[in-house]
Regions:
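Small-molecule kinase domains that catalyze NTP-dependent phosphoryl transfer to phosphate-bearing small molecules
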Residues: 152-154, 170-232
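ATP-dependent small-molecule kinase phosphotransfer cores
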Residues: 61-138
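Hydrophobic "anchor" residues on beta-strands that sit immediately upstream
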Residues: 31, 54-56, 138, 152, ...
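Well-ordered beta-strand positions
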Residues: 55, 61, 157, 200-201
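Walker A (P-loop) phosphate-binding motif
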Residues: 18-54, 59-61
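ATP-dependent NMP and nucleoside kinases share a basic, alpha-helical "lid"
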Residues: 76, 124-133, 138-174
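C-terminal accessory "lid"/substrate-recognition subdomains
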Residues: 2-19, 26, 127-130, 134, ...
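A general structural signal for well-ordered alpha-helical segments in protein cores
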Residues: 31, 46, 59, 74-78, ...
Length: 232
């Protein structure tokens, strides 16, 4: 059997760059990170893996949960960036927080300050989900800031999802993010080169949703769940 380290589906492609860790005898079969810059499509990859049976922990979803009214983390963020971030009903004005943290002079320091408050709480909740995954299952951590947190070595495989910057900006515009804000958020995150340095599997996501779903299904079936990855 020949070895082919790339899977192509339309305009999407997955490349196996480094060996995948062996399956665990107890607990989840493998614990895998899915990461990528904002607008890359990493959440879509995670959704496909979940539909195939993976247990998932979503850092972005947890980040939203810990900033809901009544959560201690919300109070810490308000103390750090201004009590006016809280509406009369106690909820967070997320748009105001984003405008205050991202972009402009000193944004790196502000982003680091926000991350220092939220990331430890997100990590603790996520890993409680991953470690509780059923015996033999695939556990997936959807985490945007994997490079920035220097956590890649904790996973059996790291799946990086990438797309050209302008494609990502267009996707964010579709979510109501202004182009200049989208570019500021992208600049505040790790570069594609930094992500490639830690990738086990690299997914180029320039195609359709169907292309992406098919390439992720192949990655799941051929690389992430077998004892040893299979190649055609």
């Amino acid at each position: 059997m020949g070895v082919n380290t790339t899977l192509n589906c339309g305009a999407c492609a997955a490349t196996l760059i480094r060996p995948i860790g062996p399956p665990h005898a107890e607990g989840p079969r493998r614990i895998v990170a899915v990461s990528g810059g904002i607008g890359s499509g990493k959440s879509s990859v995670t959704r496909v893996l979940a539909s195939l049976g993976a247990v998932t922990a979503d850092a972005d979803a947890i980040a939203r949960q810990i900033l809901e009214p009544g959560e201690p983390t919300l109070g810490e963020v308000a103390r750090a960036f201004g009590d006016d971030l809280l509406r009369e009903d106690g909820s967070l004005d997320r748009a105001l927080l984003a405008s205050r943290v991202f972009g402009g002079e000193g944004s790196d320091e502000r982003v680091a300050r926000l991350n220092a408050i939220t990331h430890p709480v997100i990590e603790a909740r996520a890993w409680s989900i991953l470690r509780a995954a059923p015996q033999g299952s695939l556990a997936v951590y959807d985490i945007p800031l994997l490079v920035e947190g220097d956590h890649a070595d904790r996973f059996d495989a790291v799946v990086i999802v990438d797309a050209p910057i302008e494609v990502r900006v267009q996707r964010l515009e579709g979510r109501g993010v202004a182009p200049e804000d989208a570019r500021a958020r992208i600049r505040a995150q790790a570069s594609s080169e930094e992500r490639r340095a830690i990738a086990t599997i690299w997914i180029d996501n320039e195609g359709s949703a169907d292309d992406l779903e098919e390439v992720v299904r192949l990655v799941y079936e051929r690389w992430l769940t077998p004892d040893v990855p299979t190649f055609d």
